[in-house]
């Protein structure tokens, strides 16, 4: 869980910016986007196979 403690003289905008940075760093956006729709086991296999191929081509 990402939390931001706001300082006494801190502006809300800067606290919000800090919160957004922490959420992005934790990978929460990517996780939400990934789990937005149900993915069948076949789709998972295909996605992982494509990722493997992409990794192999990057190594060369």
Swiss-Prot record:
InterPro entries: Ribosomal_bS21, Ribosomal_bS21_CS, Ribosomal_bS21_sf
Disulphides: none
Pfam families to which the protein is assigned, alphabetical: Ribosomal_S21
Keywords: Ribonucleoprotein, Ribosomal protein
Residue ranges with Basic residues bias: 45-60
GO biological process: one example: translation
Segments for region (Disordered): 41-60
GO molecular function terms listed in the Swiss-Prot or TrEMBL record: structural constituent of ribosome
Ribosomal protein listed as a keyword: yes
One Gene Ontology term, aspect cellular component: ribosome
Classification via NCBIfam families: S21p
HAMAP family, alphabetized: Ribosomal_bS21
PANTHER family referenced in this protein's UniProt entry, alphabetically: MITOCHONDRIAL 28S RIBOSOMAL PROTEIN S21, SMALL RIBOSOMAL SUBUNIT PROTEIN BS21M
The protein's name: Small ribosomal subunit protein bS21
Gene source species: Gloeothece citriformis (strain PCC 7424) (Cyanothece sp. (strain PCC 7424))
Underlying gene: rpsU
